[in-house]
Each structure stands twice: as C-alpha cells, then as structure tokens.
Amino acid sequence: MQTTRYRVEGKVQGVYFRASTQREAQAQGLTGWVCNCEDGAVELVATGTAQQHAKLAAWLACGPPMARVDRVIQTDEPLVLFDGFDIHY
C-alpha cells in the first residue's frame, strides 16, 4: 500500500472533476479524498496499491469529458489509511 498526493492542473473545476475522480477512485478500490484548490487546480490524496495508483494516474491524465488536463503532479506521502474516498469542500 502507498499514499500519493496528486495535483491536477488545467480546466479541472466546474467540469465534475471531483465527483468523477471519486467514482474512478472508488471503482479502483482506492481510499482518500479530493478537493478544489483556490488557484483552480484539483488536489487529491489516495491510498492503494501501485497498480491501483497506475490506473488512477492514467485516468487523471485525461479526466472527465469536459476537462482539459494540462499537468498532473504526483508526490509520495507517508502511508495514511482512510475510510472510503471523500469529496472535501
């Protein structure tokens, strides 16, 4: 298990990115959270296996249909165990 922080930049707010990310993370069996940033990016922290993270990272590179992803930054974090995958407001 590993915990990774993702920062997704581009047109990622107002396009259902958080809700779509929550659904994708849950479908992959990841736990964690996702939130909008004040600067227009989306940030998430997720815990799961390397394979789960690889699938999520591939999805984040495109995002939902109305999004335009310019960049995804991944940072390894200390392991955190979450209950479910939440949207933070």
UniProtKB/Swiss-Prot annotation:
Keywords: Hydrolase. Signal peptide: none annotated. Pfam families: Acylphosphatase. GO terms for molecular function: acylphosphatase activity. Residues 3-89 form the Acylphosphatase-like domain. Coiled coil: none annotated. The active site is at R18, N36. PROSITE patterns: ACYLPHOSPHATASE_1, ACYLPHOSPHATASE_3. It is an enzyme of class 3 (hydrolase). Its EC number is 3.6.1.7. It catalyses: an acyl phosphate + H2O = a carboxylate + phosphate + H(+). Belongs to the acylphosphatase family. This is Acylphosphatase. It comes from Saccharophagus degradans (strain 2-40 / ATCC 43961 / DSM 17024). The gene is acyP.
